[in-house]
Amino acid sequence: MNGVDDKTEVREYFNATGFDRWRRIYGDGDVNKVQLDIRTGHQKTVDTLLGWLNDDGNLNQITVCDAGCGVGSLSIPLAQAGATVFASDISEKMVGEGKDRAQALGLMQNPTFAVQDLEDLSGKYHTVVCLDVLIHYPSDQAIDMIKHLASLAEHRLILSFAPKTFLLTILKRIGEFFPGPSKTTRAYQHRESDIAAVLESCGFKIQRSAMTSTRFYFSRMLEATRN
């Protein structure tokens, strides 16, 4: 299936059955063991990223584009820390949930939320972040997407993806990588060397990396800055 069909599938999923499932996973209510494991893994990735940005000590001076923001798990704490955040997602329902969560915390104007495809994002930002989104893109589409996101980043681009390793490929094939009850869209893995090569071709150098592994959640994260 081509990239357009994948995108349509993702949009429809996260605006229908997937919305309630992932809203609960990215919340703090009761969930099943698999969903709790995924929640824990995703939060570890978010916490690692927040730690990286906080270490720089300039969050209140930078703009951040959270591309594929979901329900605002990253956008909201970034705004609370002082960053000016533009948050977008392909799912109208996910964006609506993100707005509600932000406003419940008194964040009325920051983050700025928008329903938008990654391909349609424009503007310039100090930092562009794309967490756990490339899993929806096959390799050729992911390369094009990374190039596009790189064009928006004035200083830094941070990506996370499901790494393509022998072990994880085997796990995926036997149905343990993304269990049916928790994920029903296609799950694409990517080689870290391919991601790094694209970043370097766009004039970026990898500065930091991290790996989050739980039983059902695997995410490799790379931070790259312009040379």
For the regions a protein language model found, what residue spans apply to each?
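Conserved S-adenosyl-L-methionine
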Residues: 68
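A conserved beta-strand element that flanks and buttresses the S-adenosyl-L-methionine
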Residues: 129
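Short catalytic micro-motifs in class I SAM-dependent methyltransferases
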Residues: 132-133
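A short His-aromatic
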Residues: 136-137
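Short glycine-dipeptide loop
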Residues: 152-156
